[in-house]
Amino acid sequence: MSKKSSSSAARHSLTIRSKVTLNRILEITNNSVKIEINDEGTITGRYTGTQLATIDNTTNQDGTSSWSGKFMQVTDRGEVILTTGSGTGEPPNSKGIVKIRGEGEMWTQSPRLANLNGAKWTCEGETNIRKGSTVIYVDINEMEH
């Protein structure tokens, strides 16, 4: 891991690395395409585990995009965290990299992670649309209980 990425990861609550498992084209118009993206990956940081995601993404003619997603995270201790969110993407660069950002909310039944109930999160990261891989850095604004 490069110094830049390791210091970047240390600044954030979570780092999520995922791979696309399935894409479905939902709708095509003369100025956009809507696809469903299913991916799964690993979580490191505040807690460790895995994540499953279903994301509806609409890409416009100019390459910009908007997305909304549903995410299920399972920690290495078996705790489940559910999150929803939405955001935007810039047009891909010449290497197929899309810079994305977004925000959302999360919930869990875990007593240990109860401060995540109703917590807001923001994210930023990159998706490689050629490889179907994503790295996302998440910042969680935890609730006080």
Ranges and model annotations:
Residues S2-H145:
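Beta-strand-enriched cores of mature, soluble protein domains
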